[in-house]
Every structure is written in structure tokens, then in C-alpha cells.
Amino acid sequence: MKTDLNMELMKNIADLYYNSNLTQSEIAHRYNISRPKVSRLLADARENGIVKIFIDGRNEISRFQEEQLLKRFPLKAVKVISVPHDDDQLALQITAQETARFFSGFFRPHDRIGISWGYTLYTMARYFPELSLDDISLYQIIGHIDNTSTRNHASEIIDLMGQRLHTQNAFIFPCPAVFDSPLILEMLLHDSKVKKLYESMLQCNKLIVSLAPSDTSCCLYRSGYINYSDLDLMNQCGSVGSICCHFIDQKGKLCDEGLDQRTLAIPLDVLREKEYLFAYVTSSEKVPVLYSA
């Protein structure tokens, strides 16, 4: 009996092979698996009727958009999902379900996975499929901002993902996301336990990041870490939004060095060096920062 994960992988590979005309070697490289495994999955797809069902039901517009994005940007993979435009909650649910299945196909044994927080990622974590992979570790890559008026679901995301991946190696940062001064943050990072956790987080090979627009809807504003004047100043500097609490402009450069020096999060330069960086958006407000990140 095929698992949901294998069924989804067969669908994706069948689509790339039969509809996008990729070779088995190209597909193997994209998914970091062997070419014989691709061949076996294609055979399984035929035997299970996946090829017929998937090709007949696939949204042609979404597939065209995916191929255009892959041609234009240096992406390993992309998935475009059709959602209703008149129901934001349903759109988020559909996107989160598809994203969870899509992202899970890239996880491997011994991965060290860093994950951000926020309601969008929390929704994805709720739908994440169960995987049995050896020696998986999870790390929160931004400090907390939970208070009485704002929740970022950081602990819940780590707990849910730890359950789905069957690992007890799941670690949170029990510290604020933003401090009053860089000196306080520097002193905290000298604590042996915090330092060890921070250094382990830096070694993550795959990151699931959060994106936010540069407006009053972002968590840092709603939780009181930054005010309207801070937002206004960053927007004057060309801010298009934030990735893991780093506010950037259209060229991907930091907009507020002072704020960044007080922020407990995986550094922007480290983030960009990772081989795998996962993100998903469900609203047009986050597209500018996705483009610039």
C-alpha cells in the first residue's frame, strides 16, 4: 500500500516526465534521488493509475506558471496552487495542505531543519505528513514574540513538526526575538546553553522561512517590538517586507541595521548560503519580499 507521501511524489515526477518533458536524470537531480528510483516511481505511477488521473486533472495554467518561474529564477522546484479568491481562510488551508506535502518530499535522513514561526507556517505544520527519517533535528530560527495580544505559534510549530517527523531532537529559543540593545543580545549569546543552541541552529542545512509585509500586519509591529515610526522609516528606505524578521529592500539589502543587530534570528547572510530554503505565500502582500529575498 502506497503512503500519501509516495503517491504525491509519483504525481510530481509523472507530471515532470510526461507533461514537462524532463529526462529521468533531470528529475533525479531535482529531487536528489537516483535515476533508477525515478524509473521505479514512474512504473508505479502507471500501475496505480497516477499518470492518467494526474495528467487529466492537472491545472494547465498552474503548470505553465511553474515552468515560467523555474526559467526566470534560480529555483530547485516550485508549485503553483489554484485557490478561491473570495475566501482567504480556505485559500490558506488549501495552500498549507499542498505545501506540506510538497516540502516533505525534500526531507532526507540526517537533515537539520530550521523553521520560523507564524500562523501561515503553523497551518502548514498541522497538515504535515508523518515521515520516518533517521536522525532528524528541528530548530527554531527566530526568538519568541508571544504575548497577550499576539501569538506566533513558535512552540506549537516545533511540537507538531517533531511529532510528524518522529524526532525528539526539536529545539525552541526561549528568548525574545528583539532586545532593547545589541549589548543585551550579545551577553545572552555568551550563555553556554544559548550559545550551543544558536550555533546548532546556524548549521541547519534546510530552512523553512517566514515572510511578512512591511506594514502594521507584521508580528513585530503587532507585538510592540517596533512602532509605526519604525515602519515608516523602513518604508522610506524602500522596505518591501521581512524574511525571518530581517527587513529588506527590493535589492535584498537590510533596511535597518540597528534593528537587525538587536534581533535574535538566523543571520540574513547565513540564511542565503543554505542549499535549501523553503517559503510559501498565500497573499499578494508577501510577493514583493518573496521576490527580493
Where are these regions (language model features)?
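Short, amphipathic alpha-helical "recognition" segments used to contact nucleic acids or chromatin
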Residues: L5-N21
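Short alpha-helical "recognition helix" segments of helix-turn-helix
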Residues: I13, T23-I33
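Gly/Ser/Thr-rich loops at beta-strand to alpha-helix junctions
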Residues: I113-T123, P213-D215, S283-K286
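Ligand-binding beta-strand-loop-alpha-helix segment within the catalytic cores
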Residues: E67, R72-P109, L133-S217, R222-Y228, ...
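ATP/nucleoside-binding phosphotransfer catalytic cores, i.e., glycine-rich phosphate-binding loops
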Residues: D256-A293
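Key DNA-contacting residues within the recognition helix of helix-turn-helix
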Residues: S39-L41
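Alpha-helical DNA-recognition elements
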Residues: D44
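Short Lys/Arg-enriched helix C-cap and helix-to-coil transition segments
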Residues: I50-Q65
